[in-house]
């Protein structure tokens, strides 16, 4: 079985397994030609752990070679070697045609393998990743997902959750085959995949009146005031309706109404409660217009309170239309009509007289407390001046400053009192 070849064409690979015993995981050395495909062989990939090749099984026939097992003297190392072959050699004997004594047990070179074959169960119809007559073994493909992998241990799990549309006959049919019920914004590209029509799996269903619940209006419809009895209850008009995927009959379902059906919208607009509230909203003017209307009404005399019309105190002077709420206000007003002006300005050269004291104080502030006017400036009446003293009555300098310790200062208060007494008499 072993052929003669040049040693330079062979490459020896030794794998040490220090975690196992001397006879459990022997190091292996395989010889192959570097001129062949550099992809690793299943022997070097799947014999170092508890993995099984996804494309091998005992019944298959692939180019194989007999194992030569040798027991070494070292306690932690043993070796088995594939029969040497060159690039021109072909593996003639398959693993399934070997005798029982020539086969190496699986437990000797797979550390995680045991006698339970459930861990390495491989379907017989699995596609092989090699071809007959091609020297060398290509790199095995990844483990595919087989539909036959569901064994008895996996069948004990509970059935997966199914949506209501898969069990309810009323929701199991597709609503997208009804062009008059579908709004323009929806298209078949936006349909959820599990809601797509499947003619092979869904059969035509028949809906009885007992299976269809009365459709209630949307939540926003209940905000309108009114009796609940005015709402229209939608019920099927025919006793039995036959629904199928291929027909486009006028079926009435909750999904069709919620998806924007025009029939339900028409019924909603024809409700008396909706019409009354819509008319009430249309009759209400805007806030800006209502504010203008209220301001116009408030300007008219008819809308004024009655207490304003009842004026108690009127001026008796001919031609005067003065009206006052309080008597003291009328008395002060009457002094303006009389010739009595007891309040006289004390500033030399001014001598202006006023019937009211507040008018005199305003005269001091506006006339004599400012510089540069035509009237005389008085520093004692200027709040910003260091000589500010509104109680001062006396002589003034040319620039309006007070002159203290003068006889006129002592006589001025007496003269003022005399003049006031004369005016009062």
From Swiss-Prot:
GO molecular function terms attached to this record: DNA binding; transcription coregulator activity; zinc ion binding
Coiled coil: none
Keyword Transcription: yes
Region described as Disordered: spans on this chain: 28-72, 232-257, 281-301, 365-425
Zinc finger intervals, C2H2-type: 321-345, 351-376
Composition skew (Low complexity), residue ranges: 30-44
Cell compartments where the protein resides: Nucleus
PROSITE patterns cross-referenced by the UniProt entry: ZINC_FINGER_C2H2_1, ZINC_FINGER_C2H2_2
GO biological process: conidium formation; regulation of transcription by RNA polymerase II; sporulation resulting in formation of a cellular spore
GO CC terms, sorted: nucleus
InterPro entries in alphabetical order: Zinc_finger_trans_reg, Znf_C2H2_sf, Znf_C2H2_type
Pfam (any one): zf-C2H2
Disruption-associated phenotype: Forms aconidial fluffy colonies.
Record's keyword terms, sorted: Activator, Conidiation, DNA-binding, Metal-binding, Nucleus, Repeat, Sporulation, Transcription, Transcription regulation, Zinc, Zinc-finger
Basic residues composition-biased segments: 285-294, 365-374
Compositional bias annotation for Polar residues: 232-256
Broad class of the protein's primary localization: nucleus
Function (record text): BrlA, abaA and wetA are pivotal regulators of conidiophore development and conidium maturation. They act individually and together to regulate their own expression and that of numerous other sporulation-specific genes. Binds promoters of target genes at brlA response elements (BREs) containing the conserved sequence 5'-(C/A)(A/G)AGGG(G/A)-3'. Also coordinates the expression of carbohydrate-active enzymes and of the key effectors of cell wall remodeling during autolysis.
Entry protein name: C2H2 type master regulator of conidiophore development brlA
Recorded name of the encoding gene: brlA
């Amino acid at each position: 079985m072993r052929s003669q070849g040049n040693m330079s064409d062979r490459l020896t690979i030794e794998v040490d397994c220090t975690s196992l015993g001397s006879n459990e995981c022997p190091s292996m050395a395989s010889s192959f030609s570097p001129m062949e495909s550099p992809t690793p062989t299943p022997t070097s990939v799947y014999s170092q752990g508890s993995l099984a090749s996804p494309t091998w099984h005992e019944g298959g026939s692939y180019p194989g070679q007999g194992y030569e097992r040798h027991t070494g003297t070292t306690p932690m190392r043993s070796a088995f070697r594939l029969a040497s072959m060159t690039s021109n050699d072909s593996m003639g004997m398959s693993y399934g045609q070997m005798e029982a004594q020539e086969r190496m047990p699986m437990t000797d070179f797979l550390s995680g393998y045991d006698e339970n074959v459930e861990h390495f169960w491989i379907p017989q119809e699995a596609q092989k990743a090699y071809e007959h007559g091609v020297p060398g073994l290509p790199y095995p493909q990844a483990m595919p997902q087989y539909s036959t992998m569901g064994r008895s241990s996996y069948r004990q799990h509970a059935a997966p959750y199914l949506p209501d549309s898969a069990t309810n006959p009323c929701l199991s049919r597709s609503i997208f085959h009804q062009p008059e019920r579908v709004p323009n914004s929806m298209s078949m590209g936006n349909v959820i995949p599990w809601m797509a029509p499947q003619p092979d799996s869904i059969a035509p269903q028949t809906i009885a009146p007992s299976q269809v619940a009365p459709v209630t209006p949307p939540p926003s419809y209940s905000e309108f005031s009114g009796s609940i009895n005015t709402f229209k209850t939608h019920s099927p008009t025919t006793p039995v309706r036959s629904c199928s995927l291929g027909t486009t009959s006028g079926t009435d379902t909750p999904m069709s109404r919620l998806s924007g059906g025009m029939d339900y919208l028409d019924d909603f607009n024809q409700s008396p409660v909706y019409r009354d509230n819509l008319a009430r909203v249309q009759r209400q003017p805007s806030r800006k217009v209502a504010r203008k209307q209220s301001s116009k009404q408030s300007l008219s005399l008819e809308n004024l309170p009655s207490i304003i019309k009842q004026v108690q105190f009127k001026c008796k002077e001919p031609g005067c239309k003065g009206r006052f709420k309080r008597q003291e206000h009328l008395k002060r007003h009457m002094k303006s009509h009389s010739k009595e002006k007891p309040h006289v300005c004390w500033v030399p050269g001014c001598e202006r007289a006023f019937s009211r004291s507040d008018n005199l104080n305003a005269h001091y502030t506006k006339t004599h407390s400012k510089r540069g006017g035509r009237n005389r400036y008085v520093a004692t009446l200027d709040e910003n001046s260091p000589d500010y003293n509104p109680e001062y009555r006396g002589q003034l300098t040319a620039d309006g400053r007070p002159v203290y310790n003068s006889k006129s200062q002592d006589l001025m208060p007496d003269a003022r009192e005399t003049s006031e007494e004369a005016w009062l008499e």
